[in-house]
């Protein structure tokens, strides 16, 4: 019971670190939640503050995911890895420090996959890059990657706990993109380089 609690709380607190919010405050003197899409993730930071801050957010958010995997590994089981990882994903998008708001958990999920099964991470990232090259729409690319991750986990015969994480995490990330999906269907989702014209 104590081990499960450590995995849940540790994973959640790692994921909840509000990287995008802090970078917005320190780098640009802004509240990123009131800019662009209102997300604290790297894509909204890119649109609002530029490449340098966005790269910093991307790297730190991915590191949060990798740290959650390390925590679960230290607890001694692949199931604890999955539990800590899932709660890191939740923590990123529902940060207790930001009124349970946050990002879409894409970078955090990438960090988790890199630490969990790097061939899966690289293949999934390749799918993301392909989607971006074809459409220049980050959200569409992220949705493709969320679908691809469990398929690649299965195709590469990864352990069952990791496959279940990819399934659950993929569904969660897709759910976090529901407003993006609405805009994609309406043809109003911005592409890379386009300014955000809607309210957060």
From Swiss-Prot:
This is Glycerol-3-phosphate acyltransferase. Its EC number is 2.3.1.275. Keywords: Cell inner membrane, Cell membrane, Lipid biosynthesis, Lipid metabolism, Membrane, Phospholipid biosynthesis, Phospholipid metabolism, Transferase, Transmembrane, Transmembrane helix. The chain crosses the membrane at residues 4-24, 70-90, 110-130, 158-178. GO terms for biological process: phospholipid biosynthetic process. It comes from Synechococcus sp. (strain JA-2-3B'a(2-13)) (Cyanobacteria bacterium Yellowstone B-Prime). Its main location: membrane. Disulfide bonds: none annotated. Catalyzes the transfer of an acyl group from acyl-phosphate (acyl-PO(4)) to glycerol-3-phosphate (G3P) to form lysophosphatidic acid (LPA). This enzyme utilizes acyl-phosphate as fatty acyl donor, but not acyl-CoA or acyl-ACP. The gene is plsY. It catalyses: an acyl phosphate + sn-glycerol 3-phosphate = a 1-acyl-sn-glycero-3-phosphate + phosphate. It holds the Pfam family G3P_acyltransf. It comes from the Bacteria. Probably interacts with PlsX. It is a multi-pass membrane protein. One of its GO terms (cellular component) is plasma membrane. It is an enzyme of class 2 (transferase). GO terms for molecular function: acyl-phosphate glycerol-3-phosphate acyltransferase activity. It is found in: Cell inner membrane. Pathway: Lipid metabolism; phospholipid metabolism. SMART domains: G3P_acyltransf. The keyword Cytoplasm does not apply. Belongs to the PlsY family.
